[in-house]
Amino acid sequence: MNRSKYIDNIQLSENNNKLHAHIVGWYTGGKIDDHQFYVVVDGREAESHFERVDRFDIASQNNMSSGKRIGFNLVSDIDGYEAIETLQLRVRNAGKDELLLEMNKRNIKNIVAQTAIEYNIDEAILINSEGKEARLKV
């Protein structure tokens, strides 16, 4: 494999005109410890948070020493979903800036429409035929 970057998964969801972006992938260019992944929306940097992730599979395929933290997991919450025209994922590395992903409004809306909604349920209330309640903590 001779690729230096790849996006494994993009999840976009919208709630109350806020876009929630979760992007997972890997990048092997430049000095690994200097990677700063970030999101740009309509030409302006948006608040985002990322963490580095070990990707032993990719390190092995690229003949890199094992344990390199070349994977990334990025999350960003962006206000004004309806007005967003473009979204970019970029990386700063050793003084250089590189585009990893770019989506236009149509791409964003298509991914939002296809992203499954996840719910975390912490309690269920069961009511039997006699009207008695039973609470179940999950």
Segments (PLM) and residue ranges:
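Basic, ligand-binding patches in group-transfer machinery
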Residues: 1-138
